[in-house]
Regions:
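A hydrophobic alpha-helical transmembrane-helix feature that marks the membrane cores
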Residues: 1-193
Length: 193
């Protein structure tokens, strides 16, 4: 915190560096099972720095949003866990297909929004409260669905007696999704404050 008070540019530098390192570690952890223990741990370290700085900035702008985001994240994780454990939501092949189609559709939509942002006619699209809120809510819903997927994947890995590196991969997936949920809730909390 001392570093940020004396040098405000450190916020941006820290966000950029930790963001890049987070991205690299995430790619490694997802694509190379044997590297998932180290890459997943480093991902959590760098993502922790990234989210810490992001939360510090959000709290400086709007007091109280971080605790709201933390409590919201805990609530979502608890609800999803209870729904998964009790069998209210079953992760079947149909669920996987829906999740895949929904995720691909969301990514295509986000790419189209990005492309539209390059044209002056659509320049106000990303500043539109309704559009940003809708994107955040859909992203939060998608992250919640991925948490069901991650829990099922972890259960399958444990039950099948897969090697330890796959357990690390499942743990990485759960951590990644919970942090995704936190960022989306933080974003929504800032918007409504």
């Amino acid at each position: 915190i001392y570093m940020f008070i004396n040098n405000p540019n450190a916020y941006v530098t820290t966000l950029i560096i930790s963001g890049i390192l987070t991205f690299v570690c995430a790619l490694l952890a997802m694509s190379v099972p044997k590297a998932s223990m180290i890459a997943g741990t480093l991902y959590c370290l760098f993502e922790g720095i990234f989210i810490g700085v992001l939360s510090l900035l959000a709290e400086a702008v709007v007091g109280g949003v971080v605790i709201t985001a933390v409590l919201g994240t805990i609530s979502v994780v608890l609800v999803v866990s209870v729904m998964y454990i009790t069998g209210l939501v079953k992760v079947t092949q149909g669920f996987y297909r829906f999740l895949f189609m929904f995720a691909v559709g969301f990514m295509v939509c986000m790419l189209l929004l990005l492309l539209f942002s390059f044209f002056p006619v659509f320049s106000g699209l990303f500043n539109n409260f309704g559009v940003v809120l809708l994107v955040s809510i859909i992203s939060l819903f998608l992250a919640s669905l991925y948490l069901f997927f991650d829990l099922k994947q972890a259960q399958n890995i444990v039950e099948s007696g897969s090697p330890k590196e796959f357990e690390w991969m499942a743990a990485f997936g759960i951590a990644y999704t919970i942090l995704w949920i936190y960022v989306q809730i933080l974003r929504i909390a800032v918007m409504f404050s």
